Amino acid sequence: MIESRVMEYLNEKAMVAEAMARCYAKGLTTTTGGNISLRVGGVMLITPSGKDKSSLKSEDIAEVDIATGKNLTPEKKLSIETEMHRLIYVKREDAVSVVHSHPVYCCLFSASEEEIDTSLIAESWYLLDKVKKVPYALMGTRELAERVSDYAKEGYNALLLENHGALSVGKSTINAFDRLECMEQAAHLTVLSRLIRTKGIDEKERNRIAEMR
């Protein structure tokens, strides 16, 4: 049974493992921090808990039934944020992948009253629109899962989890990763923009960019 599970969804699991390794390589998470998931039909593939995120392999990726939350690979320890990922898929039919990590500048804004300015460059406005902050809830809890998934249900693809980290929703692992990386870049640019005079993209151009999505 376990051997057959290893072979199932092999390509999709490889994509999840690769995205997690890229997240670590880009400095967007710590060795065991963060989690990435991918919806494949009624199953969610998700990175496990307690593993080195820089060297995950296909066989490390866990499987969860989206409808019930059952761990289909009980030999693997699930991420504490599994329920958060699962509820996003339950509430967002268009969600295919979710990336959650703890990038430095996003974490800075998650602990601040300031907002990330996504209007400084066209790419961040195109990929993110606005970044929404989710009120604090203890990590790994049902309360956090409900809060985050409710905001995702409203259509937000870029979220800051107060005093915690960042989360993105995408149409693929690369799309979700791109959004999270772009959110961190936008956060960094927002900090740097305090040092020199900048101007964001005006409303007319923002609307034109939005029409391209």
Which residues are covered by each model-predicted region?
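Glycine-rich flexible loops
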Residues: I2-R213
